[in-house]
Amino acid sequence: MNEQYSAMRSNVSMLGKLLGDTIKEALGENILDKVETIRKLSKSSRAGNEKHRQELLTTLQNLSNDELLPVARAFSQFLNLTNTAEQYHTISPHGEAASNPAQLSSAFERLKESKDLTERDIRDAVESLSIELVLTAHPTEITRRTLIHKLVEVNTCLKQLDHNDLADYERNQIMRRLRQLIAQSWHTDEIRKIRPTPVDEAKWGFAVVENSLWEGVPAFLRELDEQLEQAFGYRLPVDAVPVRFTSWMGGDRDGNPNVTAEVTRHVLLLSRWKAADLFLRDIQVLVSELSMSECTPELLELAGGSEVQEPYRAIMKSLRSQLSSTLSYLEARLTGEERLPPKDLLITNEQLWEPLHACYQSLKSCGMGIIADGRLLDTLRRVRCFGVPLVRIDVRQESTRHTEALAEITRYLGLGDYESWSESDKQAFLIRELSSKRPLLPRYWEPSADTKEVLDTCRVIAKAPQGSIAAYVISMARTPSDVLAVHLLLKEAGCSFALPVAPLFETLDDLNNADDVMTQLLSIDWYRGFIQGKQMVMIGYSDSAKDAGVMAASWAQYRAQDALIKTCEKAGIALTLFHGRGGSIGRGGAPAHAALLSQPPGSLKGGLRVTEQGEMIRFKYGLPEVTISSLALYTGAILEANLLPPPEPKQEWHEVMDELSRVSCDMYRGYVRENPDFVPYFRAATPELELGKLPLGSRPAKRRPNGGVESLRAIPWIFAWTQNRLMLPAWLGAGAALQKVVDDGKQEQLEEMCRDWPFFSTRIGMLEMVFAKADLWLAEYYDQRLVDEKLWPLGKQLRDQLAADINIVLAISNDDHLMADLPWIAESIALRNVYTDPLNVLQAELLHRSRQQEKPDADLELALMVTIAGVAAGMRNTG
């Protein structure tokens, strides 16, 4: 195994040395010596040397205020460089890319070997493949965009250094560039000074498309084509759209007053502007490349007739002109200038597709397939994947905002208070109004600001070019009327198309009731007629885990999906399940392949729709090569889940999970909700209060400014526990429940479930990953430094529970150590721990010092923020 990681360790060592040189040049030998002493002590401490652990604590506690910031920055920047080397390792010929068989080809081999599948079954599954990745602006990307660009270039340099035939001067040039990039990073503030706006977040999303996905998606589809041809002898249809991207940036207003109707309108324009800009660049390349004169009669006519010498170029130049005028018009709109749209304004994907596809068909017909399947095919694939909107937008709003808006309308009209009506009365009113030809909204009525905002958002949707809005998601959906209310508000706004409206079920009770709600909805004739046989439902992972703990939440999510699949199948409805997963385990995060194969059978028939959140976007799609790998993983897993589904779990496994769910939920809530010491302990032992000062995202950390834990959003809740290494939301309750079932004599049954049921084995695997990242001595150190002594018994209780949980999980998985079956992740965690541990100790020290001061010193605060960023990099996830 050491050989497999030697190239990565060599890169980490080289980058560390270059960072050391930069620090020495900037701050002198003394600071570098101090950093190096701390690193060596940390490494020895990790190896079990207790004396060096105490020396590490003493050294960090004795740092002067002047030394705190440079030491924190050194370890934080080193972790960013380590992550970059690790990301390169996943795509390097010396790393994971070489040691793992190609993900697609191995999946296709498994499909071919199955005696139950015909080639037609496989072909149909491939051609109906649907992966929709929803990029969200959850405030978990802590690394500044300016630093991300530098780290991407560091990755490029590592790739160049891997070439065996480099001349000495070429290698020296690359090393010089690496030194420059590391020096630039060191002399750049790693902490944002101001909180990003929703428009800034949307621009970050567009930058991911421009810098990675624009190249990565066509490259992935070429790879898929080649693997299909090798395995089955056919290629993807040119118009296949296996991958699409949607965004919540600029559309997600749930709990974020900064996302207004005007912001959404602006982001929709910005998205179209960026699409026109990117397609214009593509077309300019094609103008240069498509210089051929031979073509079909149909194309010659399209190009302008027999006088045209270079018909392909003529068509490309016409498209170039159209894109230029579209770009100019959208630029004017973005600056607030009212201008008549040009006659050739690009509004639909077909306006781009038809001339490009005509060129493609002509080239194929004239024996120039090699040219057709080059950059022209890439552009056609981009039209299908991104299109004129670039990324479609989801609008998300909380259910009570719609209820309050309708209540204001009914009170004004003298119909009573909608909010106080029974569910059956609400439904009767909504169906009557949805079926009515007359408008509900009074003409000259002046609504309150909140209601006006809800209605204005619906009007933005109604006026948006068709295809630019993907869905309307209702958070905290609890009843059929929550869904019908949105349909009515959209109708009143003049929405002429049937926009998918997805209820989001996210608490334990709501997940348990999801099937009842959808059964009631599907029994309404008007609703069945309106949705035309298609329904989207979103499953919330983060809030359910915060509400009930991970074990109870994951079982409720599984059961809700299973019930919804069966209900929709029975009703003849095509169900798309939309998974609201986060990057961390406490918010539903899991390695993609394991997560997909652990879903209930049939859950991916309608395709995969899943959120990609915060820092996970960079880890999974930050480079074109990483994008190819991530999409290949998803593709292989979806095809296997649909064509080779796991067997239905046994009834007794269901019963064991019911018991695990009940016991774990009771224990989790016993601590989080019922123990009066828990909230004071949480506030003292974690940097929860200090996290609010980090300008991470546009959304406030709390739903209600003065609320307790229950009002805290799932992201800062998990972020805080990740920082002090107790990782509590990702395990509390789970191990105790497993122990109870073992004590009841069912260990063999648990081992069987772990062996034969992907859902359960994935849960155990996720617990192992959390335990590998958690750290008992660091969590104890936070308590000693920050927590009132009278709360220490609670901290000890939680740490003892964590230690017991680790033992029970190892007993069930029959392993001697954590992550035995995922050595790559274990190696990755071990590599980063040496640099994360000093940051944790430093963070506890900084929290201790800053909490002693009435007005914390600005340098102390900055150093604290740097440690938070560094620990986030070390843990590879924040919230």
Swiss-Prot record:
Listed GO biological process terms: carbon fixation; oxaloacetate metabolic process; tricarboxylic acid cycle
E.C. designation(s): 4.1.1.31
Single GO molecular function: phosphoenolpyruvate carboxylase activity
Pfam family, one: PEPcase
Gene Ontology cellular component terms for the protein in this record: cytosol
Cited SUPFAM superfamilies: Phosphoenolpyruvate/pyruvate domain (SSF51621)
Keyword vocabulary terms for this entry: Carbon dioxide fixation, Lyase, Magnesium
Signal peptide extent: none
Catalytic activity, reaction form: oxaloacetate + phosphate = phosphoenolpyruvate + hydrogencarbonate
Cofactor: Mg(2+)
Keyword Lyase attached: yes
Active site: H138, K546
Family, as annotated: Belongs to the PEPCase type 1 family.
PANTHER family reported in the protein's UniProt record: PHOSPHOENOLPYRUVATE CARBOXYLASE
Job description of the protein: Forms oxaloacetate, a four-carbon dicarboxylic acid source for the tricarboxylic acid cycle.
Annotated protein name in UniProt: Phosphoenolpyruvate carboxylase
Organism from which the protein derives: Pectobacterium carotovorum subsp. carotovorum (strain PC1)
Source species taxonomy: Bacteria, Pseudomonadati, Pseudomonadota, Gammaproteobacteria, Enterobacterales
